[in-house]
Every structure is written in C-alpha cells, then in structure tokens.
C-alpha cells in the first residue's frame, strides 16, 4: 500500500509513554500530535488507515486518563501520609519553638485530615522560612497560583532546580502532573537539597513539606472542580469523530469488499454503527474494546494494497 506513517511514530509513542507523568494531558498537545499523523506519507487525511491510526492514538490517551480518574480517591490520603512523614522529620531537626508550631499542624492533620490544612501549612511554611531568612520575599498567596508562590520559599536549591519544579508543577487547569511525576520530583528535590547532615537535613525536609503542600492544594482543586472530566469529555468527542468516520467507510461498499475475508471484524463494526452514541464520554471498558478493535482494523488496512482501496 501507499507509504505508511512511520516517520512521526516516535513522537506519538513518546507522548503515550510519558502519559503516566500527567494526571491528564493538555488537550492542545493531543490535538497537535493528532494532526501530525499522516504528514510524512502520501495518503489523504481521510484515508481509513490514517483514521484508524488517529482513533487508536486517541483511545490509548483516553484509556490512560480514565485510569488516572479511577485513582483520584486515593490521592489526597497518600499526600497526607507524605506530609505527616516529612513534618515529623522536619520537627526532629528543628529547635523547640519550631517543634511546637509543627506539632500544632500535625495535630490538625491527625484530627481534621485535610480540612483547613492548607492554610495551616502555608502559615507554617511562611513562618519557618522567615524565621531563618528575615529578608525573604513577603508576598501573600494569590488565589491558586501555588507553584509560583512556592518558588520563593524553597530553601538552598539552584535556579535550575527551581525551573524543574516550575515545569513539572505548571499552574492552571489545562494539564496536571500525576502522582508519579510528583514522587519523581520529590526524590529529585531531596537530592538537590544537600546531604543528610544538619542543617541540610532541615532544609531538605522543609522543601519536601513545601512540595507536598503544593501537591495537596493543586490536587484538591483539580478533584473538587473535576478538571479531569473536561479532558475525558474532549478526548471522547475526538475519538467519536474518528470512529464515526471509520465506521462509515467500513460499512460502505469499498469497506465491505475489503473486509469480506475478516467477517468477525466487519460484524463488530456493524455493531458499532448500530450503537454509535456521540454525546457521552467513553468509559474505560469501552475504551479498551475500541483499542482492540482499532488495532485489528489497522493491521488489516496496513496489509492491503493501494488498489484495494479503489
């Protein structure tokens, strides 16, 4: 058949491989990659093979985001455990007056969990930072730009590390780092904060409390406003469009002729055509089924000669 889309496969695979670092991706990035499918081959954008490739890419992205959605109930409890752990370590390396302040926050965490915890954490961070660095920037926290605010409080890290933090923890609702990305950043930040001896140990654990405070604020906001559902809905709609286009071609005369020796696959597409619903978000089980269907369909299309599309 006509030349395939091997040239731009690597960016697609790289994006899919790195999806575990995003709680949900920026839809603009998904659309950009979607539009690169087929640019390096001589097939028209409406060709069924390219439609199948776009559909398969979207289905895989959607599957990853849906899986992250299922984990949302576990995120805040995990962050609270991290905060309790690092607050206790920070207290161990702190003087008596700071230990009292930290103990109050720990007591609040144990009795009230995350209710009102973010305000107490920011107050503690601000006090500890200013007690040790009297010339610290004195800026009130503006709304939800937690990442920008946190960058003025990190202690003893390089400009390069601050840039890494800013890149991973980008503010806004267009995308969101995953818990895996936050764990990776936590380890990187701990290594960048210096050796484990005092006073570097205090600095390292202070920076960890700050990072997980930012994570708590960002994830609580993300979950409360259900930002991930917007990503799921948009990607679902894009996938519906590709499936609808591919379905129309497969049940046409040309498609029927090409798939005449793949009757089980054709039957599945006829079922999709009969039950096509383009308004609802695609569920995780349906997404897995679409991936299997699109993979088999793509395989058939890749092994057809160009003449068979005529």
From Swiss-Prot:
One of its GO terms (biological process) is release from viral latency. The keyword Transmembrane helix does not apply. It comes from the Viruses. Pfam families: Herpes_BBRF1. Disulfide bonds: none annotated. Keywords: Early protein, Transcription, Transcription regulation. InterPro entries: Herpes_BBRF1. Enhances the ability of BRLF1 to induce lytic infection by cooperating with it to transcriptionally activate the BZLF1 promoter. Belongs to the lymphocryptovirus BBRF1 family. This is Transcriptional activator BRRF1.
């Amino acid at each position: 058949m006509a030349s395939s889309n091997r040239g731009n496969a690597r960016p697609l695979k790289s994006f899919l491989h790195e999806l575990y670092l995003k709680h949900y991706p920026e839809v603009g990035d998904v659309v950009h990659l979607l539009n690169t499918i087929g640019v390096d081959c001589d097939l028209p954008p409406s060709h069924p093979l390219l439609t199948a490739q776009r559909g398969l890419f979207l289905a895989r992205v959607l599957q990853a985001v849906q899986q992250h959605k299922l984990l949302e109930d576990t995120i805040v409890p995990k962050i609270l455990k991290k905060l309790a752990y690092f607050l206790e370590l920070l207290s161990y390396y702190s003087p008596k007056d700071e230990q009292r302040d930290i103990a109050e926050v720990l007591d609040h965490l144990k009795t009230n969990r995350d209710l009102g915890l973010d305000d107490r954490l920011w107050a503690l961070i601000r006090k500890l930072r200013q007690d040790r660095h009297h010339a610290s920037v004195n800026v009130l926290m503006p709304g939800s730009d937690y990442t920008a605010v946190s960058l003025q409080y990190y202690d003893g890290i390089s400009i390069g590390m601050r840039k890494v933090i800013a890149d991973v923890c980008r503010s806004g609702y267009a995308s969101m780092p995953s818990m895996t990305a936050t764990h990776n950043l936590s380890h990187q930040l701990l290594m960048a904060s210096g050796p484990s001896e005092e006073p570097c140990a205090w600095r390292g654990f202070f920076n960890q409390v700050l990072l997980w405070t930012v994570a708590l604020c960002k994830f609580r906001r993300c979950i409360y406003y259900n930002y991930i559902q917007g990503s799921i809905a948009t990607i679902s709609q894009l996938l519906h469009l590709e499936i609808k286009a591919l379905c129309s071609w497969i049940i046409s005369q040309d498609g029927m002729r090409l798939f005449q020796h793949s009757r089980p696959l054709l039957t599945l597409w006829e079922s999709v055509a009969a039950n096509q619903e383009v308004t609802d978000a695609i569920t995780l089980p349906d997404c897995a089924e679409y991936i299997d269907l699109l993979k088999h369909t793509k395989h058939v299309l890749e092994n057809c000669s160009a003449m068979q599309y005529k």
